[in-house]
Amino acid sequence: MKRLLRFLKGYEKESFLAPLFKMLEATFELIVPLVVARIMDIGIKNQDNVYIWHQCVIMVLLGVIGLACSLIAQYFSAKAAMGFSTALRKELFFHISRLSYRELDMLGTPTLVTRITNDVNQAQTGVNMVLRLFLRSPFIVVGAVIMSFTIDVKIGLIFLIAVPVISIVIYGIMRTTVPIYKKAQSFLDRISLITRENHVGARVVRAFGRQQEEYKEFSEVNDDYTKVQVRAGKISALLNPATTVIMNFAIIGILWYGSKEVSVGILTQGEVVALVNYMNQILIALIALANLIVAVTKAMASGVRLNEVLDTQPSLTDQGNSVQKENAGAARVVFEDVSFTYAGSKEPALSHISFTAKPGETIGIIGGTGCGKSTLVNLIPRFYDVTSGNVVIDGNNVKEYPFSQLRKKVGMVPQQAVLFKGTIRDNMKWGKEDASEEEIQRALSIAQASGFVKSKPEGLNTMVSQGGANLSGGQRQRLTIARALVGDPEILIMDDSASALDFATDAALRHAIHEQTKGMTVFIVSQRATSIKQADKILVLDDGELAGVGTHKELMESCEVYREICLSQLSEQEVNR
């Protein structure tokens, strides 16, 4: 948690003033019992109403000034805590956006979401409470003990005994509950994961009638979380009665010994009442300190989790200072004995892949499920770094390109058609921020999306809901293809991005791409043989290895894997067409 305190930079003044005003409030609070003692010993004893009213006015003033100090302290602590969480959340968001797919796969989306929301909130609460209580509570305890000694040294010893005993009880309860709270946080992560998976896969869950099974899984984890929280709650519930019992014994001691000293004239009745008030103040301060410890413990646990994210360094480094020669026209892509293994996997996803895609060629990639097709094309824009070998674009290793230049060269259409909340125009401009109307319309036309966009009353200004939920699967895919085309990239990668299109639309799309993207090197990943049949070169993958390279005709003669795929999907006449 200490390492996160750097995010309080810029709020040094608030971080100083918040505890200062809390200590001022505590000072006024410590004076109040003495005023009460004077009212009893002088005003009431002498039946001096003027004196009583005078002291009451002083009490009111002390209360008002204390309240003002408290409100000012609350303002400064809240401002500092909110500034802290805002800076931390921004840094986390920026840091996560720099992580490669490897780190994102390792950390997991649900965990990252929990950390940037719940854990940041826990850290914010911890900072807020520390600024308000970390000096105030000890100040009250020490101040009350000192005040008790100024009234009577022997009764002050009762305070010296009671405070450590209450502190030990609080420490014991906190030491027991803190690990339980940490365990509860892990269950909360699991709940977040299940909830997210169920929400994202809601259609699949309902399609297979798995609602009861999903509910059962969620209920089990939720019940475990509840049990842990209840267990922590039961132990924490001992805090108030245990400390109250100790305090009551201390008060009994004060009253018993105080009454004896009152009877002999050493103490006054007002002073005994003041001592009881100081004991109550100590108890309240220690309980507040216990709550602070709980909040700080949760904040520290969250701090560890947040530091885990911040300490995760991106495995891909951006050669931001490199200056590469811009090549006009389509790009040449070369794979030189490329192998790749996912983090944590024992088996390579790709093994010894070598091929050359000449400028302007269309490369089809086909193979069985899980054979490494998507992995291969993800290496071109450098979403992952190769384990061995080289990926070369226009004579330069992809590692030598600045990310901005490399991503500008490559237009990526991912397997999952992801659209963002906003208008269709907004989504198109992801491909090119200053795209003109003509460029957008051309991209939509090639992607076979102009028809349905024009049919919308608002056209390009039609609102797209989060994830494109208000569009069909085929419409989403066509818009993501158009988005990639708007930027007029040198390399276009379509990763099984036409799977939701009917055969006629798919054929029209392939024809448009072939005719109107002469200046691009195109990679088409597909499960459909018809989608890659006309490609200049076809790569056939089998269990991460290159089973064949060539044209459709060449592979039908030389590659058994490709022949089996084609014959399983097409008739003999369609194969030879």
Predicted regions and their residues:
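Membrane-integrated ABC transporters
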Residues: 1-29, 36, 44-58, 65, ...
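Transmembrane helices of ABC transporter permease
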Residues: 10, 14-27, 62, 129-184, ...
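An intracellular "coupling" helix at the cytosolic face of ABC transporter transmembrane type-1 domains
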Residues: 10-13, 98-102, 118-127, 131, ...
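Hydrophobic alpha-helical transmembrane bundles that constitute the permease/transmembrane domains
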Residues: 19, 23-31, 64-71, 123-126, ...
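Short intracellular "coupling" helices and adjacent cytoplasmic loop segments at the cytosolic face
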Residues: 46-47, 82, 90-114, 118-120, ...
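Helix-loop-helix
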Residues: 47-51, 147-161, 170, 231-305, ...
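ABC-type nucleotide-binding domain
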Residues: 326-577
